[in-house]
Each structure stands twice: as structure tokens, then as C-alpha cells.
């Protein structure tokens, strides 16, 4: 690897990157999103994103995504979520899983974030999605663009 910066510090190696595991859950042709809290200390406050989070030490992405779903919406997938793709272009190692949300939205108990919603493909493409909780449209997190592009590419392949 090359040397960068005035202090001659080595560029970050992938091993040093944050790893996150996220869930792209589908129900009735819509996808489950989380509206992040309006807290300045978190990444992309007040943006729509996917449920999931950072891997704990020694945890696999698959274990992490199941734990996070239980912590964030009190739901455990009845079947194993399928690894969909991984992406490290945004400075963190993102593992995206996909699966079916097997319960209606009103059976989820939101414990992290300020709102949740099943968004249509049209809404995802518009990049601004209505929040009932906030009574206004909120932007999608930049990281979600990779997921949406992947989704659109697959739909064109079909």
C-alpha cells in the first residue's frame, strides 16, 4: 500500500475499517426503512436508512444483522437472511442481507430511530420519503444509494 498524508501515515487497511451489517427486508413489494434520530453525534441524522449496525468483536455479519434487528425492532427473522452483497467503497465495509419481513409493520416495536416505513421503489428512487412521525419528507442516507442502484440493476436483469 502507498504512503499518504504529511505525517507519512499508512492509508487505512480494510482490516481497520468499520464493518456494518444491514437488512434489506421486503414485504408486499416494499422495503423496510428506518428514520435515524435527529442527533448530531450519529452518522446521517434524520435520514432514512436500513436497520442494522456495527459488528461486535468476533461476530459474523449474519449474527450481527439478526442481533441488530432484535435490538432495533424486536423482530427475529424466522429464516436465515440471504447475504446479498458487500461494498467497501464508502470507507466502511458494508454487508447487506435481504429477506422477507414476515409480520405487518404494526407488529414491530421500534426501539432505535424515530420512525419506520415500508417504502416503494418509486419512493426509494425519489430520495425523499414521507415520515408520519415527523409530518414531512426526509432524505435517504447516501449509503442507501448503493442498495437502490443494486435493486434497480437486478430488476432490469429480470
Where in the sequence are the language-model features?
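Short secondary-structure boundary/capping segments
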Residues: 15, 23-24, 40-41, 86-87, ...
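Conserved N-terminal beta-strand and adjoining loop/helix that marks the start
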Residues: 8-33, 51
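Conserved Nudix-box catalytic region and its N-terminal flanking loop in Nudix hydrolases
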Residues: 30-71
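Charged phosphate-binding loop/patch that engages nucleotide di/tri-phosphates or the phosphate backbone
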Residues: 136-158
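Unchanged
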Residues: 54-137
Amino acid at each position: 500500500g502507498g504512503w499518504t498524508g504529511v505525517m507519512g501515515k499508512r492509508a487505512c487497511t480494510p482490516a481497520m475499517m468499520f464493518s456494518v451489517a444491514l437488512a434489506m427486508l421486503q414485504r408486499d413489494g416494499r422495503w423496510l426503512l428506518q428514520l435515524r434520530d435527529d442527533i448530531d453525534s450519529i452518522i446521517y441524522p434524520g435520514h432514512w436508512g436500513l436497520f442494522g449496525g456495527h459488528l461486535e468483536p468476533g461476530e459474523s455479519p449474519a449474527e450481527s444483522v439478526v442481533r441488530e434487528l432484535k435490538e432495533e425492532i424486536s423482530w427475529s427473522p424466522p429464516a436465515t437472511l440471504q447475504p446479498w452483497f458487500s461494498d467497501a467503497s464508502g470507507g466502511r465495509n458494508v454487508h447487506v442481507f435481504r429477506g422477507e419481513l414476515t409480520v405487518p409493520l404494526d407488529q414491530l416495536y421500534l426501539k432505535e430511530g424515530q420512525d419506520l416505513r415500508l417504502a416503494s421503489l418509486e419512493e426509494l428512487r425519489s430520495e425523499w420519503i414521507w415520515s408520519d412521525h415527523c409530518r414531512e419528507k426526509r432524505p435517504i442516507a447516501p449509503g442507501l444509494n448503493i442498495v437502490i442502484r443494486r435493486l434497480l440493476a437486478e430488476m432490469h436483469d429480470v
